[in-house]
Amino acid sequence: MSNSSSVYDWFQERLEIQDITDDVTSKYVPPHVNIFYCLGGITLVCFLIQFATGFAMTFYYKPTVTQAYNSVSYLMTDVSFGWLIRSVHRWSASMMVLMLILHVFRVYLTGGFKRPRELTWVTGVVMAVITVAFGVTGYSLPWDQVGYWAVKIVSGVPAAIPIIGDFMVELLRGGESVGQSTLTRFYSLHTFVLPWSLAVFMLMHFLMIRKQGISGPL
């Protein structure tokens, strides 16, 4: 008996991986499914590209108001293929938003939000909100003029909310004005809170799809 077969048998005995493999590879695909049903999967691919390129940029990015812009400039001009990594990150971000919008339209037009898939739709809407938050927080990280004023405007929007508005503004900014605490918060959101939140909701989304299957034609 070969070593590879022994290893496989060891895992099979404990995890029954063959049953998992059979379930994944034998899932029924309805005949009405076409290329537009791939938009959600493309959105996932864009997210994975975002994760990989974003992780690479954390080796060079410095989340301080005095060094953020210069660290991005250094990445673009001095790091080997740094310009490509950041460009792919930006392009895939735009592609992710576009694919998400098209995916939402496809699901809505084909009635994929109806019973019994309401919770699948809800998790999708939550992921759409998280994706928008990704864009807002990522836009500010270079800390150039565009990023600074974008943060100032966006973080000031909750001020219009009665009672808790001022508290939310101070929570986002880390104080009364935009500064280092604001950049730190946005960096933390963009690189830790939002990615893991999106990953959790993606897992829930996919498990529901696996359980309920793809919605039928109208």
Curated annotation (Swiss-Prot):
Q: Enumerate the InterPro entries for this protein.
A: Cyt_b/b6_N (IPR005797), Cyt_B6_PetB (IPR023530), Cytb/b6-like_sf (IPR027387), Cytochrome_b_N_euk/bac (IPR048259), Di-haem_cyt_TM (IPR016174)
Miscellaneous comment in the UniProt entry for this protein: Heme 1 (or BH or b566) is high-potential and absorbs at about 566 nm, and heme 2 (or BL or b562) is low-potential and absorbs at about 562 nm.
List residues traversing the bilayer: 35-55, 93-113, 119-139, 189-209
GO terms under biological process:
photosynthesis; respiratory electron transport chain
Which Gene3D superfamilies does UniProt cross-reference here? Answer: Cytochrome Bc1 Complex, Chain C
Give the matching CDD domains: Cytochrome_b_N (cd00284)
Keyword check for Cell division, yes or no. Answer: no
Instruction: Write out the residues that bind heme c.
Output: C38
Coiled-coil features, chain-numbered ranges: none
Record carries keyword Kinase: no
Q: Which amino acid positions bind heme b 1, per UniProt?
A: H103, H205
Q: What is this protein called?
A: Cytochrome b6
Q: Which cofactors are required for activity?
A: heme b; heme c
Any one annotated GO CC term: plasma membrane-derived thylakoid membrane
Compartments (UniProt record):
Cellular thylakoid membrane
Which taxonomic lineage is given here? Answer: Bacteria, Bacillati, Cyanobacteriota, Cyanophyceae, Synechococcales
A single Pfam family it belongs to is Cytochrome_B
